[in-house]
Swiss-Prot record:
GO CC annotation terms, alphabetical: cell outer membrane; pore complex
Name assigned to this protein: Chitoporin
Gene Ontology biological process terms in this record: monoatomic ion transport; oligosaccharide transport; polysaccharide transport
InterPro entries on file: OM_porin_bac, Porin_dom_sf
Gene it is expressed from: chiP
Predominant subcellular localization, coarse grouping: membrane
Signal peptide: 1-32
Family as reported in the entry's similarity comment: Belongs to the outer membrane porin (Opr) (TC 1.B.25) family.
Molecular function (Gene Ontology), one example: porin activity
PANTHER family: CHITOPORIN
Length: 468
């Protein structure tokens, strides 16, 4: 087991600050009571064990350890009420404890902390235990208007989003928005966010933003977005975002729900677009023209026990990168963006030209006298994945006229405790078999986001609790 490291001093100062506030804030009791009386302190204990093997086509197609580790997380999340019904404070921290890790396991494993504290310093050399302050924000509300500033996670309608392990990543910045309810005519909500630093949940220190060369500064990211709920089961959303002087991103989504055979049927169309401002064939020139990912989703719930999903995506990402990214800075874990498609089948299925179809089902076993139990399965098939349309230094496997296929299936078993002190604790076992239908090595041949065949097993425990 590795020793603790990280931001003990930062966390201690933050907690001390909250404690001290009760002594030195002088406001009328009627105004201060909301801050304390409406506050909450929640948390959780989390366990993650993973065994993932990946085929090495350069060494006789042997499967080799890619991830093999067992890690604990725990968090505390304090959310105040509002003093004078206007001002509040949120603060949260979590710890990661590396219990075991195979020496051949890849880094970072994204559940513990990387040995490198900052995203742009990442050298994939190892993981460690530690503590991270992931939320420390002042908050404000007045009528339909709200705002937050500090260490925050986006909550509004913008394109900005954090990475997730058990805990979310953190932006340094500010977000503000408003919501207006027009009765039967619908409800409008919109927000704006600005940020100048970010850390993924497996990094302990904030880092600035850069272009793909990791040298050219990007001073800030910002985004604005809106949602209109027509209150007739039709919802429209749109957003625009920018990394300063570098990448513009676009988002639109239409969702609709209706009854089919007495059961709810949901559908959506989603569009994600990105365009960079560099056109000089340098490393910062990631797309040629506008790249996009389109998605069509269908969901159907049968007899309140079976959830069915049918979803499809289509990608266009001409240029040097060769795949679509929802974030506005291309470097790994440097920022993140909204993407409402999640299949948990290993690949992102986002190569240039790639089309993918997903089918999934979850079955609640409560009618079999097994309350809390659920089982599921899913399958993805993808085709027409093209490599980058150009590369400065292509490898021997690069052929711009090639296309490849990918496929994957997953099995799930979930149990959630239904009563007792540990009510709500969830145990989940997830297995994935992924197949890259080619003999190209991982990340090779101009496929910068496609790896070789994998077998992946995850065991997860989530135990939430409330202190007050």
């Amino acid at each position: 087991m590795r020793t603790f490291s990280g931001k003990r001093s930062t966390l201690a100062l933050a907690i001390a600050g909250i404690t001290a506030m009760s002594g030195w804030i002088v406001v009328p009791q009627a105004q201060a009571s909301g801050f304390f009386d409406d506050s909450t302190l929640t948390g959780g204990i989390y366990y993650w064990q993973r065994e993932r093997d990946r085929k090495d086509v350069t060494d006789g197609d042997k499967y080799k350890t890619n991830l093999s580790h067992a890690t604990w997380n725990a968090n505390l999340d304090f959310q105040s009420g509002y003093a004078a019904d206007m001002f509040g404070l949120d603060i949260a921290a979590f710890t990661a404890i590396e219990m075991a890790e195979n020496g051949d396991s890849g880094h970072p494993n994204e559940i513990a902390f990387s040995k490198k504290n900052k995203g742009y310093d990442e050298d994939y050399s190892g993981d460690k235990s530690g503590i991270s302050l992931y939320k420390a924000a002042a908050k404000f509300k007045y009528g339909p208007v709200w705002a937050r500033a500090g260490y925050i996670q986006p909550t509004g309608q913008t394109l900005l989003a954090p990475h997730w392990s058990f805990m979310p990543g953190t932006y340094q910045g500010a977000e503000a928005g408003a919501s207006f309810d027009y009765g039967d005519a619908g409800a409008l909500s919109f927000s704006y966010m600005w940020t100048n630093e970010y850390k993924a949940p497996w990094h302990t220190e904030m880092d600035k933003f850069y272009q793909a060369d990791k040298k050219t500064n990007v001073d800030y990211l910002h985004s604005i977005g809106a949602k209109y709920d027509f209150k007739n089961d039709l919802v429209l959303e749109a957003a625009f975002g920018q990394s300063e002087g570098y990448v513009d991103q676009y988002f639109a989504k239409a969702s609709y729900k209706f009854d089919l055979g007495g059961n709810p049927f949901t559908t959506s169309y989603q569009f994600y677009g990105a365009r960079d401002k560099v056109d000089d064939r340098s490393v910062n020139d990631i797309y040629d023209g506008t790249a996009w990912l389109q998605a069509l989703t269908f969901g159907y719930k049968v007899a309140e026990v079976v959830d069915l999903r049918l979803e499809g995506t289509w990608v266009k990402a001409d240029g040097q990168q060769g795949y679509f990214l929802q974030r506005m800075t291309p470097t790994y874990a440097s920022s993140n963006g909204r993407l409402d498609i999640w299949w948990d089948n290993r690949s992102d299925f986002n190569a240039n030209g790639e089309k993918a179809v997903f089918f999934g089902a979850m079955y609640d076993l409560k009618n079999w006298n097994l309350p809390g139990w659920a089982v599921g399965a899913s399958y993805v098939y993808a085709w027409d994945a093209k490599p980058a349309t150009w590369q400065s230094n292509p490898d021997a496997y690069y052929d711009k006229n090639r296309t490849i296929e990918e496929s994957s299936y997953s099995l799930d078993a979930v149990y959630t405790l239904q009563e007792g002190r540990a009510k709500g604790t969830m145990f989940k076992l997830h297995f994935t078999e992924y197949d890259n239908h080619s003999n190209i090595p991982s990340w090779g041949g101009g496929y910068g986001n496609i790896f070789q065949d994998e077998r992946d097993v995850k065991f997860i425990v989530i135990a939430p609790f409330t202190i007050f």
